[in-house]
Amino acid sequence: MTPAQRLRQLANLLNASTPLGLLLARLAGTTTLKGPRGLIIATGYDRKLPIAGAFAVGNVIIYRTGPEAALANSVLLGHEERHSTQYACLGLPFLALYFAAAGWSLLRHGNPASGNPFERHAGLEAGGYTYDGVPRLGRRRHRQ
């Protein structure tokens, strides 16, 4: 691991986001394994929410798929790794900030990602999202 990856790992341990991710993974009955770059991969998540195919809580990346499919998708892993770094910077308040940004994006764009700065920073396409650049809310109506 690089020094930055070790720092992220330590920050997410100290800010309790990785322990929360491990608790969530355990309660959901996932299988965990050591992943690359200090990440922990949890596979077999079958709860209804969130709907995403993968999501991060601290250094824990939780997938719906099995371990082979999870590790084979390096683009999605990179996207979730960027969320892991966001947790390292913001700690547990990241959860509330993320959901507020997703709600704002849903209101403005009709989806939780296009206007969400956390998803945009992590890479919309890498996370399986498409960009809807035209906000629904605040559009001007042209009179005829």
Task: Label each residue range with its predicted role.
Residues 75-87:
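Active-site recognition of the HExxH zinc-binding catalytic motif
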Residues 66, 86-90:
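Active-site-proximal flexible loops/turns
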Residues 2-51, 56, 90, 94-144:
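Metalloprotease/metallohydrolase-associated module, dominated by Zn2+-dependent proteases
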Residues 68, 80-81, 119, 125:
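Glutamate identity and glutamate-enriched acidic tracts
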Residues 51-54, 61-77:
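Short pre-active-site segment immediately N-terminal to the catalytic Zn-binding motif
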